[in-house]
Amino acid sequence: MKELELKYGCNPNQKPSRVFMKDGRDLPITVVNGRPGYINLLDAFNGWQLVRELKAATGLPAATSFKHVSPAGAAVGLPLTDIEKKIYWVDDLGELSPLASAYARARGADRMSSFGDFIALSDVCDEDTARLIKREVSDGVVAPGYTGEALELLKSKKNGNYCIIQIDPEYVPAELETKDVFGVTFEQGRNELKIDDELFSNIVTENKELPESAKIDLAIAMITLKYTQSNSVCYVKGGAAIGIGAGQQSRIHCTRLAGDKADKWFLRQSPQVLGLPFKEDIRRADRDNTIDVYISDDYEDVIGEGEWQKYFTEQPKVFTREERKAWLKNNTDVTLGSDAFFPFGDNVERANRSGVKYIAQPGGSIRDDIVIETCNKYGMVMCFTGIRLFHH
């Protein structure tokens, strides 16, 4: 297939729309089911690159959950704890395959943002992963292949219209890439930068103890940032991105946004949230929305009189701000990556409040000394990578 006609571009008024290969080669994808849209394919190609690089860097199956050309989550296939199974709504599925575990983590990091996602998988989609995808609200999936059982499950989604794309894992794009804006063609070399342990060798803080687990998490953070709209900051713990701040104009807003998401991920693991007495017929998306409000200062919107009856069998107790702060102090050894340098120490101060201990950023600010000093104050380990990872 040399070109694929699309229903429309970014918006319904943008017609005609298609994807094709300028060099006349066949497209590196096969549409197995459904009809992908313009933004679906942007998510698919960015997501595929992300999971392919995660697999190469860690040796583990990888998955990402994309929305509007940025990842909402990304993870590798490490086993899930019992608590993680509960907060990702997979505790009823038994033991999951590594690939399914990766997607459960990627989807579960920021379930509000992942609603209606486009999924990318590094490995052949197996039955476990398909069963997990089937019960989530999702636009589509891209993978290098699918088992027969997985295809049968996925094709039953969205009344048979779920978008399933198979990508050629051997496809290598041209070294130069182009795009047109306002009738002007932009050309640049592809960002083929390889992210591995060597990137984290320049440790500039007093604390220089960087365990292997932190190196894996830093690699996940930096690879995730490589395919996230800039400016961006990514918090990672235990093989999964737990907070991604994408597309912000200031670095501190990235750090705050990603930190707030990481905090919500950890608050979901608290006894107060795990013990919420939900009605049995409450849908998964409604549970996610309710939890998101419950752990905020707007909790009265879901537990106030006349409201709690919609969601719960009995009125939950308030999860106070003081209780939330106390719980968040238990979140430790979080890693953080930034796609460009920290211009001020305020980013480190905010990161510290979300349990960050390991940081990777390019360095190069005129205030590097202040940023390093702030890290030293908290005993953090910070690497200067010397590379910027802007993505647009």
Describe each model-derived feature in a short phrase.
Residues M1-L199, A214-S232:
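Active-site loops and adjacent core secondary-structure elements that bind or stabilize anionic groups
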Residues D23-R35, A109-F115, G189-K208, A285-E307, ...:
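Gly-rich Lys/Arg/Thr-decorated short loops/hinges at beta-loop-alpha junctions or inter-strand turns
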Residues E53, Y227, K264-R268, R353, ...:
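Conserved helix-loop functional segments at active or binding sites
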Residues A57-S65, I164-I167, S230-K237, L267-F278, ...:
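Flexible, glycine/charged-enriched surface loops at secondary-structure junctions
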Residues S70, C125, K237-A240, Q248, ...:
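Active-site-proximal loop/turn and secondary-structure-junction residues that shape catalytic pockets
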Residues A72, D117, L121-S122, R135-I165, ...:
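C-terminal binding/interaction regions
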Residues A72-R111, I242-F341:
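Glycine- and Gly-Pro-enriched alpha-helical subdomains that act as flexible
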Residues I220, T228, Y235-G238, G245, ...:
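Nucleic-acid 5′ end/cap handling module spanning
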